[in-house]
Amino acid sequence: MMKKLIFSLTFLFILSFAHAQNMHLSFNKLLNNYVSPEGKVNYAGLKKNKHTLDAYIDMLAKTKVMENWGKSEKLSFWINTYNALTIRTIVEHFPVKSIKDIDGGDPWKVKRFTNGGKALSLNDIENNILRPMGDSRIHFAINCAAASCPPIANKAFDAENVDALLEKRTTHFINDAYFNMISHDRAKISKIFDWYKSDFPNLDAFLTKYNTQHTIVDSKTAISYFDYDWKLND
């Protein structure tokens, strides 16, 4: 009896994991087709294929985030959900010059997604689901459709690639001089580090770790921030 129970639970876990892996395939194809390697988004093309994006988001809405999912499954699910919703927000209003031209300048507060009986905004997903998971690298994976936002990856996150892809996106962002310019004496960095200070309690060590020149950032480094460009990332 116990062996049957263990087998059944194992089988259900495998099915759940397989579903979590495969659910993002259609989004992965959309990103492959409509996002450049540099993170520029072809919203006009996506608008013509909106039915595929809608079907993906509908599937996400109907998917129960299981307690037995690991952190990697949950992270990839919610990162993809955030990015898909952001893309659809732009597509529904395209052509538009900036995401801040939508919903009175604050589209992040609009409840545009329902999962598990809860209506969620982009702010809810970011601040109440993703940030509490304790991985500050999510800030370089979720995309706000703006020029100064960390470029969106042209592939979907999944349980197998999420850690490596978070690492890659973070490293790419930190070392792109459009977003961050780092030397020992002074560092001019993205406004993201100012807005989300609490997620980077040891910012000096974070910047030192991820800049590929291995420049030491410490208490002697003068920190300033780039202005944020809200122009559309197309």
Predicted regions, residues:
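N-terminal secretory signal peptides that target proteins for export/translocation
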Residues: 1-2
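Cysteine-nucleophile amide-bond enzymes
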Residues: 18-20
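Interaction/scaffold regions that mediate signaling and macromolecular assembly across diverse proteins
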Residues: 22-234
